[in-house]
Structure formats: C-alpha cells, structure tokens
Amino acid sequence: MKTILRASRIGRVILRYRLDALLEGTPAERWLRLAKPFVPRASAEIAAQSRGARLRLALQELGPIFVKFGQILSTRRDLIPPDVAEELTLLQDRVKPFDGEAARLIVERALGLPVSVAFAAFDTTPLASASIAQVHAATLPPDANGLRREVVVKVLRPDIERQIDADIALLHSLATLVERTHPRADKIRPREVVAEIEGTLSAELDLQREGANASVLRRFWEGSDDLYVPEVIWSHTAERALTLERVYGIPSDDVAKLDAAGIDRKALAAKGVRVFYTQVFRDNFFHADAHAGNIWVDSDPERCLNPRFIALDFGIMGQLSQEDQYYLAENFMAIFHKDYRRMAELHVEAGWMPSNVRIDELEAAARSVCEPYFTRPLSEISLAEVLIKLFRVAQRYELTLQPQLILLQKTLLNIEGVGRQLDPKLDIWAVARPVLERILRERYSPRRVLGELRKRLPEIMTHAPDMPRLVHSWLKQQVEGRHQLDIRSSELRALDLSLRKLQTRVVTAITGSGLLVVAAVLYGLHPNGWYLGTVPVWSWISGGAGSAALLIAWLRR
C-alpha cells in the first residue's frame, strides 16, 4: 500500500512540473493523462523554466533520496542531454537535520559506549546535514599529554536504510516498466542506472568503509603540500558512526574568502589538476565526489602562497583496472599529440569499440570530436568534454561503459570546474601533460618493471618448472591443429597465413616474457659480477632482449 501511495505521489509531482513528456510512448503516460485533470499544474513561473530546471525542482520536492538520484544521474552525461545534466549538478544535498539526541543514541549503539565516556564533549547541534548522514562537532578525552583533540562525528540518519530500500524498490519497478515500454529504453538503460544508484547509496551507508577510504587516501598523500586528508579516529568509528580529525578551511568555490585570505588561486587551480592526475595514474585511487563542497582550501596563513586542498567525504572512491589505466593514459597522450589514428586504435584495443569497426571510420569520428576544441583558446579547452564526446561515439556501437570510467569522467568534469572557478584562464592541457608524461615514465621505467617482477619472484619461481611443459603442450596443439586444417579456398589460405603469423608472435612474446623472468630472477639473486647501478649487467641484457622481443611481437600485429 505504501508503495502505491508513493508511486501516486511521484505521478502527481511529474504532472505538476510538466514532466510527463519524459514518459511519452509508455503505459505510464496513459495513466498520467487520465490523472492530469485532477492534479494542479505548476505556477506560470515554474512552467516557463527549462525541462532540466523543472526536473531539478521535482526531485527536490520528492525528497532526499531522489535528490541523491538526481546527483548521480547528473554524472551520466552519456545518457542524458547536457542541458539537463547541468541543471542536475545544482541539486543541493542539504536537508532538515534530525534530532541531536537521536544522533547521540545512534553513536552510543554504534560504539558500544555512552557518549559521555567516548567523548569529552559532543555537540547535539549538527554542523551540517545531508540526505544520508549529518555531522556533529565533538572533543576526545584528554590523551597522555592532557591534550583534548577536536573531531567531527558523521552519523547515519535513523531508519535511512528502510527509506532507501523502499525508494530503490520503487525505482526498480519504474525502471522495469520503462525498459519494457519506452521506445528509447536501449539508450537510456534504466535498470543499469538504478543499479548504479543502488550501489552508490549502499557504499555511502557503510561509514566504516568510508573511513577505510579516507585512511588509504591519507597514506598516499601523507606529508604532501598539495592535499591534506583528515585522520580517521578508528577507536571511535563503526558502521553507523565515523569520527575524523576536525579540519578548518575555506570551500574552494568561495572566491571572495580565498582572496581575503591572500590565497594564490592560480597556483591552487594548477595543483587541483595535478592532484587529480596523480590520484588516477600514480595511486589508482581517486576521490570520485570531488565537487566544491567536498574540497576545501587550508586556511593556514602560512600556506597562502603555497596553498593546499583539504579532502572531505570519502564515500565514493574510484579505481581503474590496469588495462583501463594504460589505455586512458595513452588516449590522453594521443589527444595531446592530435594523433587521431592512435585514438581510434586505442578505443578498439581497450574493448570500448567492437573489434570489427573500421579504424578509418573511427579516426574520422575522433577528428570531428576533437578538432573543434583545438580552435578554442587554451583556457576554454576541456579534457572532460572531449572524453565524454569520445565515449558518446562509442555508444553509437551500443557498447556499455564501465561504471569506473563514468565515475572518472564525472570527477574530471568536477575538477576542471573547480580549477576554472579558481583561475578562469587555467590551461588544463599545459598543467596535465607534463604530470601525465612524468607519471607514465616512472610507471613503465625499467627499474619499476624490474621491481614489480622482483615482488612476483616467489610466484614466478613456483610456476616456472611448469612453463616448459605448458608451452610445449600449447605449441603441439597448435601444430596439430594446423596439420588438420583442410585448405579449400584463398580465404582459408589467408587465414592459415594469419595463424602462422600469430604463432610466430606468440612464440616471440613467450620468449620475451621468459627473458624478463630471467632478468627478474638474476636481480633477485644478487649474483656476483658486474653491476650497472644497483642492477646486474646480465639483468640489463636479459631484460633488454626480453623487452625487444615483446616490442617485435607487438609491432607485428
């Protein structure tokens, strides 16, 4: 019954804000048409607004869970029009706070201690309140030196899980209906969108997980002059309560306060871009909810000429597979060099395009996306927009992007927005390119590769005795398969030639891999003899020969 009432309320809001066109061609549209005479329409002022603005207002009226839904939907620029996405980014996740005494009870249940024991002071008036949780100021009991440390305690809203489950169940039902009846369901992919929202909300409901995210990010940036991450107080953290060191700063979009504090906004904007690319390509652990409200600037007067960011809210973090990291980095470098052919090849190699797509067709599509950007002033070029448009090209071939890539493009868009707000003339390309080149040099340097091989040495040594037998068995199968092939046409002869080339490439690649293994073994054993730096000469020779063999195998594609 509650679900029916909730669905009817959603229907009334859709009609009042004149959003029924979104359901055109579905059974829901027919039901709404019947109900339309009985629902008061929005004022002329609201009716005059754009569809994106009307959708934003409707989501705000439906409540905090739908606000969160709109915020997540705003990141899916591959699915919704740009004008709607821009409006949804204006959604504010601020709601009426719940009772401070209820927050105290939740903290006591989570920690298994009375608040009066766990904290020297706990302010029941929240500092901030959002749809999932609210934040309270507190003070820890004195430590061994008699110091009382200031902290903040993030507390989940009471019964939030039940509210989310009910609304998500309703969204699943609506998504199923839209998927069955909407003429553009294959493009919208409603069930996929709802599943993404469900996953995001589920992650934000576990504050212990958020604490772990903050702890990992802090470890990567400890001692940095670019980014500060508050310390997690693990003794006062549980699934429904997260305690962090209290930090003071200025929101990154409050330009007036930044100027009053004497902050070098130009230096700060460049740092923001560098921090993002370092998180993605060095650490492979990036803050994926990096809007201005979650990025503060350290207000310490001594840092005004060398400012640093403060990260907040670690509920959503992103990671890429090694393959996506590599292909994305290479894609950025191809964009920097205007190498459209390479961009097309990378999209196919990465699996973002079907393997049977014509490379020249894809090259032309990449050129049509990128060239208009290169005619703009450098301060107006957006890598995020280029990436989004390239992924939209991929959508023509009905491929589904990985959620982490969607997270990344949304985060890049946010970071560019913050950077341009701080410094409207920010040349993102000039800042990003040297950072990316340096990280790639370090990531794929011989020393780094040998170090990775050395880490895997025990695993390699364990499986090494089986390698000759496995290689021999595989080659034998290939030879037998070739002899059994009955060639009857020129196409089959071409296929046979292709298979022979493939076998040669595989053998060359296996040889190269074997030589790299030998290089790693020699490096790990520290043999007597000549050294070049800290690496044995024979390791350099074996590693160089192995790398050359792998390069030859790659060039013979």
Curated annotation (Swiss-Prot):
UniProt-listed Enzyme Commission number(s): 2.7.-.-
Molecular function terms from GO: ATP binding; protein kinase activity
Transmembrane segments: 506-526, 535-555
Leader sequence segment: none
Record membrane topology: Multi-pass membrane protein
Domain Protein kinase residues, every copy: 121-509
Amino-acid positions noted as binding ATP in the UniProt annotation, renumbered to this chain: L127, A128, S129, A130, S131, I132, A133, Q134, V135, K154
Enzyme class (EC, first level): transferase
SUPFAM superfamilies according to UniProt: Protein kinase-like (PK-like) (SSF56112)
GO biological process: regulation of ubiquinone biosynthetic process; ubiquinone biosynthetic process
Active site positions: D289
Magnesium recorded as keyword: no
Keywords: ATP-binding, Cell inner membrane, Cell membrane, Kinase, Membrane, Nucleotide-binding, Transferase, Transmembrane, Transmembrane helix, Ubiquinone biosynthesis
GO cellular component: plasma membrane
UniProt subcellular location: Cell inner membrane
Pathway(s) the chain acts in: Cofactor biosynthesis; ubiquinone biosynthesis [regulation]
CDD domains with a match to the protein in the record: UbiB
Entry's family note: Belongs to the ABC1 family. UbiB subfamily.
Record function comment: Is probably a protein kinase regulator of UbiI activity which is involved in aerobic coenzyme Q (ubiquinone) biosynthesis.
Protein name: Probable protein kinase UbiB
Organism annotation: Xanthomonas campestris pv. campestris (strain B100)
Higher taxonomy: Bacteria, Pseudomonadati, Pseudomonadota, Gammaproteobacteria, Lysobacterales
